[in-house]
């Protein structure tokens, strides 16, 4: 299994705090950055290969990745990061995504028990949602039906909708099917949307 971390965005909603570094290089309590924490937890969970998409500040991400010699880290640059969303970065990374996939957004901070639990679950395809939290205004929500994920968007409401956290465990076949749909969006020039639009 490989991990894919999306870190090609500008982080514009964070204003001046991301002027000199990407969101994933934001320091948490104790001084550890989000990216460092994610890589540390991935390594601890037994992941050996990580693909990271990059936009601005590639060098900062590379320097952090170099601190983990047990991880084979591949950086995939998105030269169009200013004009595209991470659906395009996902597409650019396709050649490296030839395995089961653990996919997460680069600004997520999660408990140390999460990844081992997700990886140990016998289900091949897993996504994370929280039925106890109120729906966020601007962040991801999901719609479920019959226990299966039907839709992920920032613009959902109503019955069957829940707060969603973009962490996915995907079988190789499921990841490939999603990437096929992503390729259709890219071919149509529809690169300003979320990768979840192509689910």
Question: What would you call each of these model-derived segments?
Answer:
Residues 61-140:
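Conserved beta-loop-beta/alpha segment of the NTase-like Rossmann-fold superfamily
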Residues 46-47, 72, 97, 148:
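Short loop/turn motifs at secondary-structure junctions
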Residues 20-23, 29, 33, 84, ...:
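Residues at secondary-structure transition points
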Residues 111-189:
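Conserved core of the sugar-phosphate nucleotidyltransferase
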Residues 187-199:
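Catalytic core and acceptor-binding pocket of nucleotide-sugar-dependent glycosyltransferases
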Residues 34-37, 89-92, 198:
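Well-ordered alpha-helical segments embedded in enzymatic catalytic cores
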Residues 13, 60-63, 113, 177, ...:
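Phosphate- and divalent-cation-binding pockets in alpha/beta enzyme and binding domains
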Residues 1-61:
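N-terminal glycine-rich phosphate-binding loop and ensuing alpha1 helix
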């Amino acid at each position: 299994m490989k991990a894919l971390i999306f870190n090609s965005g500008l982080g514009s909603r964070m204003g001046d705090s991301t002027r000199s570094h990407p969101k994933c290089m934001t320091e948490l309590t104790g001084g550890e950055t989000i990216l460092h924490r994610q890589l540390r937890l991935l390594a601890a969970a037994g992941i050996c290969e990580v693909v990271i998409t990059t936009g601005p500040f590639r060098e900062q991400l590379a320097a952090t990745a170099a601190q983990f010699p047990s991880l084979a880290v591949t950086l995939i640059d998105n030269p169009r990061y200013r004009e595209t969303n991470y659906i395009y970065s996902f597409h650019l990374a396709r050649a490296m995504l030839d395995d089961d996939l653990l996919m997460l957004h680069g600004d997520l901070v999660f408990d140390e028990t999460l990844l081992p639990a997700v990886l140990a679950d016998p289900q091949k395809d897993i996504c994370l949602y929280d039925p106890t939290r109120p729906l966020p205004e601007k962040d991801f929500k999901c719609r479920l039906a019959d226990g299966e994920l039907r839709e992920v968007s920032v613009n959902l409401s109503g019955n069957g909708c829940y707060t969603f956290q973009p962490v996915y465990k995907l079988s190789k076949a499921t990841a490939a099917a999603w990437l096929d749909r992503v390729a259709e969006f890219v071919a149509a020039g529809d690169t300003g949307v979320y990768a979840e639009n192509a689910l």
